[in-house]
């Protein structure tokens, strides 16, 4: 799996590399941070929960929560800091939707709160990476609107490039994707991308622009793939059909980012065997609430002198 990823990264060598940041681990112990969104039965975000309200289980075993932070409160900057990634599909299948997608991307950037880092990836059969800080967005707007459509779709490869660039960074990592969900070009296969997502702490928010006949096999499959990315990472999927729907979608994403909790624990399983670990976050005394979070993670085998990624 690593060889295709390395080949993809070579295509993007001209782009400036993201600066690695050490995770917020202490005393040699490895913290697992889980970002959690909580809503009530009416879909309203719940922001007043306390640490004792939560139970975090890994492979069925309760863990001791040592870090608790709310996005709407000051402090805990290291675990709450936002790194934003944006994937913009410019392939042939998106030609009819490209203008709407470009409008969606720029409107989202105008609305998003200040992020520590902003990485934008344009992709068709090629992958083009741009990195801007939040003080220099005009150049990014110009590039978005200058993007031309054409070529096959390397969605999975583009995701792999983004995931590699934020590997090892602390804080919350959010990937917003403007795409129809189809992939016709990638070297990576879907199971490999899923493996990469499980090894990351990236929440995926696909904004899906269907470019195939409604109900067709291709359309159903593409949407199902995007839905799976959102579900497994604790993100959410949106399906706008008109530009007037975009503002409400952005507000939902931004409201969610501003209402999240981060729960951190040191796993009672200190093996670095590369095996999948299942996560469950429960509110035993608030069964009326719905909790969303990443559902699993993989601990990469530890390299000598380094901490494993979680």
Describe each PLM feature range.
Residues 2-13:
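Bacterial N-terminal signal peptides
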Residues 14-310:
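Scaffold/interface architecture of coatomer-like assemblies
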């Amino acid at each position: 799996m690593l060889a295709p990823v390395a080949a993809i990264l070579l295509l993007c060598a001209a782009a400036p590399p993201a600066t690695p940041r050490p995770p917020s681990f202490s005393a040699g112990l490895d913290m697992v941070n889980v970002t959690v969104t909580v809503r009530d039965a009416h879909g309203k975000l719940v922001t007043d929960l306390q640490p004792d309200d939560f139970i975090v289980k890994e492979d069925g075993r309760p863990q001791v929560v040592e870090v608790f932070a709310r996005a709407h409160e000051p402090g805990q900057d290291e675990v709450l800091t936002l790194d934003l990634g944006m994937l913009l599909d410019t392939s042939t299948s998106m030609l009819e939707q490209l203008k709407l997608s470009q409008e969606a991307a720029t409107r989202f950037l105008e609305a998003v709160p200040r992020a520590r880092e902003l990485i934008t990836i344009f992709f068709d059969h090629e992958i083009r990476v741009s990195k801007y800080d939040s003080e220099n967005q005009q150049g990014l707007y110009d590039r978005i609107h200058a993007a031309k459509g054409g070529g096959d779709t390397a969605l999975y490869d583009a995701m792999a490039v983004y995931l590699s660039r934020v590997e090892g960074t602390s804080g919350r990592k959010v990937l917003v994707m403007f795409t129809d969900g189809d992939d016709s070009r990638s070297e990576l296969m879907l199971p490999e991308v899923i493996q990469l997502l499980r090894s990351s702490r990236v929440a995926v928010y696909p904004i899906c622009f269907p470019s195939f006949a409604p109900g067709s096999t291709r359309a159903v499959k593409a949407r199902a793939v995007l839905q799976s990315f959102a579900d497994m990472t604790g993100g959410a999927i949106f399906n706008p059909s008109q530009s007037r729907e975009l503002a409400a979608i952005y507000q939902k994403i931004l409201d969610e980012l501003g209402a999240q909790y981060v729960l951190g624990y040191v796993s009672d399983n200190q093996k670095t065997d590369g095996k999948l670990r299942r996560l469950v976050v429960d509110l035993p005394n608030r069964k009326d609430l719905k909790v969303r979070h990443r559902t699993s993670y993989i601990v990469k085998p530890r390299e000598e002198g380094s901490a494993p990624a979680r």
